[in-house]
Amino acid sequence: MKTVTALLLVSLAVVAIEGQHMKSQRCVCLGAGLNMVKPVLIEKIEILPSSPSCGHMEVIATLKNGAGKRCLNPKSKFTKKIIDKIEKNNRNAR
């Protein structure tokens, strides 16, 4: 009986550790994000689609000169125009 109890505790510990691993994969952006960033400051744009760990799309702008990353509001006009341009470029590249 003690062996079964010990195995059960070890199994629960493994499940708890695996469950915690999934919690670390959450949304990158906190809040809605910025409505606009000066286009000349943008080096790269990343679009992260919604997923089981984050229920909404995220748009992340990497800024030039090591100024960091900024989350953009996917619902803003500015961000929608950027997404449209990226999608258009992807279609033309095919």
From Swiss-Prot:
Biological processes per GO annotation: defense response; immune response
Biological function: Ligand for cxcr3.2. Chemotactic for macrophages.
InterPro entries: Chemokine_b/g/d, Chemokine_CXC, Chemokine_IL8-like_dom, CXC_Chemokine_domain, Interleukin_8-like_sf
Disulfide bridges in this chain: 27-54, 29-71
Gene name as annotated: cxcl11.1
A GO MF label: chemoattractant activity
Keywords assigned by UniProt, alphabetized: Chemotaxis, Cytokine, Disulfide bond, Secreted, Signal
Predominant subcellular localization, coarse grouping: secreted
Induction: Up-regulated in response to bacterial infection by S.typhimurium or M.marinum.
GO cellular component: extracellular space
Annotated organism of origin: Danio rerio (Zebrafish)
Gene3D superfamilies (alphabetical): 2.40.50.40
Highest taxon listed in the record's lineage: Eukaryota
Protein name, per record: C-X-C motif chemokine 11-1
Family from the record: Belongs to the intercrine alpha (chemokine CxC) family.
CDD domains in UniProt: Chemokine_CXC
Cellular location(s): Secreted
Signal sequence annotation: 1-19
Keyword Disulfide bond included in the entry's annotation: yes
